């Protein structure tokens, strides 16, 4: 499923960043959802919780911005904008 792959990629990137910096866990992340990503904020949160289970990102608080501009060149993408780490 396209949505699952997008969310899984974000979880991988978040966890990779946490591991590379020696963080104990991820406390939060800011994510931007393109208008054509086929994800609502609620749907993204649900998938993130499932994909992040048993990872350093489990329980991370998500701040999600949803674009409404289908003409945006990144409208089909999900962008990880920032990550909060507990080091």
Where are these regions (language model features)?
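N-terminal, polar/charged subdomain of small-to-medium soluble alpha/beta proteins
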Residues: 1-87
